[in-house]
Swiss-Prot record:
It comes from Methylomonas sp. (strain J). Gene3D superfamilies: Cupredoxins - blue copper proteins. Pfam families: Copper-bind. Disulfide bonds join C3-C26. This is Azurin iso-2.
Amino acid sequence: ASCETTVTSGDTMTYSTRSISVPASCAEFTVNFEHKGHMPKTGMGHNWVLAKSADVGDVAKEGAHAGADNNFVTPGDKRVIAFTPIIGGGEKTSVKFKVSALSKDEAYTYFCSYPGHFSMMRGTLKLEE
């Protein structure tokens, strides 16, 4: 089982994949995130944020107010399982999180917290046996 995946985006509000499966056998899971576009992060910046599906609306709404310096994620938000910085065209980043933070009975959503991107840039993540 692979304990990492790569998600890409570009100068549109889309992710390259709509779903991610995390093997339960992994201790940690890494998401490599690449922006293959050309626009700067101030114009079309993206990130990858993971939370329980039930929480994402509030996490995104509150994160938008946290500002660019905080990558549009509220500092210390316990509902956020993992997130990457906001990146622009040609940049890449990654985030690693403990698989023990996930439950197989829970639904998770990953999304971009850049203001206005949340409704289109999202996907599902699930823990697999």
